[in-house]
């Protein structure tokens, strides 16, 4: 009986040690066992245009619409775009191109006044420009593509979290609600009315009512389209000082940050998400 009792105690001790070792190993491998995994996708509402009625939801990567705000990266992207936008066509006259002689305007001594040089001196109001450059001047700067993609996603995320990003679409997804009769599943206005056998385009009237209905008149708006939308361009032409209609391939960080409301087609959002997500993943893998 004593041998059997000792054997049972030994087995229990071995089992306890094995359980303790397993728990210790798990705690070592996972120091935060109760930590939640952050979501990889955010549900974005898809709407019709111009009523902005919700139609359905689509998952969009959180790296595109829910990225944490990084003002430093946004600033680098804005400076990069503005530098590359500079034409560099200025051609100011230098000392050798101003046309004046090299003779001193006054003697070096004896006049009782301060010393002066020739008429080409940059200190004179009609003198040559100091360190004048000859056009063309290249002011472009460089920025890693990974950093620019992060800035682009930051700009979209900032507008989305501020409630100023509206996704328009519904042609390629299952709709929860039907599209209203006078609406479209894209950023366009093609409504016409027939009067005495002639078709009259009413897009400008509809667009004006759209601005008044959602209190957008006088605000800077950005419409990002998948393709060229002639109806939208024609309708927004009277407000071109405040309204920008840009195709998805030509959108910049400046455009997104400058806008007070952004309307983007679902296909364009998918294109931008894949383009900049691929760029980030490619840079990380390298």
UniProtKB/Swiss-Prot annotation:
Top-level taxon of origin: Eukaryota
Record Pfam families: Ribosomal_L4
GO cellular component term of the entry, any: mitochondrial large ribosomal subunit
Stretch list, region Disordered: 85-132
Transit peptide: 1-26
Signal sequence interval, chain numbering: none
Keywords for the protein's UniProt record, in alphabetical order: Mitochondrion, Ribonucleoprotein, Ribosomal protein, Transit peptide
GO BP, sorted A to Z: mitochondrial translation
Gene Ontology MF terms in the entry: structural constituent of ribosome
Subcellular location: Mitochondrion
SUPFAM superfamilies: Ribosomal protein L4 (SSF52166)
Family in the record: Belongs to the universal ribosomal protein uL4 family.
PANTHER family the record matches: 50S RIBOSOMAL PROTEIN L4, LARGE RIBOSOMAL SUBUNIT PROTEIN UL4M
Subunit description: Component of the mitochondrial large ribosomal subunit (mt-LSU). Mature yeast 74S mitochondrial ribosomes consist of a small (37S) and a large (54S) subunit. The 37S small subunit contains a 15S ribosomal RNA (15S mt-rRNA) and 34 different proteins. The 54S large subunit contains a 21S rRNA (21S mt-rRNA) and 46 different proteins.
Note: Present with 1200 molecules/cell in log phase SD medium.
The protein's role, per its UniProt record: Component of the mitochondrial ribosome (mitoribosome), a dedicated translation machinery responsible for the synthesis of mitochondrial genome-encoded proteins, including at least some of the essential transmembrane subunits of the mitochondrial respiratory chain. The mitoribosomes are attached to the mitochondrial inner membrane and translation products are cotranslationally integrated into the membrane.
Identification of the protein by name: Large ribosomal subunit protein uL4m
Species of the source: Saccharomyces cerevisiae (strain ATCC 204508 / S288c)
Gene: YML6
């Amino acid at each position: 009986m004593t041998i059997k009792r000792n054997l049972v105690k030994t087995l229990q001790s071995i089992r306890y040690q094995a359980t303790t070792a397993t728990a210790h190993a798990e705690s070592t491998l996972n120091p935060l066992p109760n930590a939640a995994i952050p979501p990889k996708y955010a549900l974005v509402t898809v709407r019709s245009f111009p009523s902005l009625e919700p139609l359905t939801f689509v998952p969009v990567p959180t790296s595109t619409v829910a990225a944490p705000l990084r003002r430093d990266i946004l600033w680098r992207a804005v400076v990069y775009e503005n530098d590359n936008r500079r034409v560099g066509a200025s051609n100011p006259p230098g000392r050798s191109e101003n046309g004046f002689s090299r003779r001193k305007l006054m003697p070096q001594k004896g006049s009782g006044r301060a010393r002066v040089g020739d008429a080409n001196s940059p200190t004179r109001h009609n003198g040559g420009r100091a360190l004048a450059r000859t056009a063309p001047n290249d002011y472009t700067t460089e920025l890693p593509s990974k950093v620019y993609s992060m800035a682009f996603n930051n700009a979209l995320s900032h507008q989305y979290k501020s409630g100023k990003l509206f996704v328009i679409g519904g042609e390629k997804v299952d709709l929860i609600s039907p599209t209203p009769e006078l609406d479209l599943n894209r950023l366009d206005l093609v409504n016409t009315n027939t009067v005495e056998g002639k078709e009259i385009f009413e897009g400008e009237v509809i667009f004006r009512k759209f601005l008044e209905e959602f209190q957008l008149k006088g605000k800077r708006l950005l419409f990002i389209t998948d393709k060229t939308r002639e109806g939208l361009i024609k309708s927004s032409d009277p407000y071109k000082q405040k309204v920008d209609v840009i195709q998805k391939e030509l959108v910049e960080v400046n455009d997104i940050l400058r806008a007070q409301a952004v309307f983007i087609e679902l296909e364009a959002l998918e294109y931008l998400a894949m383009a900049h997500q691929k760029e980030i993943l490619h840079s990380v893998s390298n």
